[in-house]
């Protein structure tokens, strides 16, 4: 299971393009790009920095609760100073503001490895926490 993170520019829907929400789309885009860069550099801490401490992650095997558990779930993929699963990218399908402190991102993730490519969809609920936008719910398939 892969958590989608942005390596590409996010297409902003009109709901987030309003002047009062434009900074949200920029901040989410930057947080996702930093997370993707962490994945691709083999930096687990940087990859999971986008998650809130109390985030939930829905996987085919069940619910993972909390950033520490999400980090532990991904740790086996980050060995020897790299990432053993390949290069992560995604194509956003929709980024929609829900209210001033919440936004929903739907995207297709792609993981390109040496011998195979995996792809799927993800739905990420972001919440503004202080000066940062954090993933509070991740459903990837």
Each language-model region and where it sits:
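Short, low-complexity N-terminal intrinsically disordered segments enriched in polar/charged residues
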Residues: 2-4, 8-53, 69
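Short beta-strand edge/turn micro-motifs at domain boundaries
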Residues: 119-141
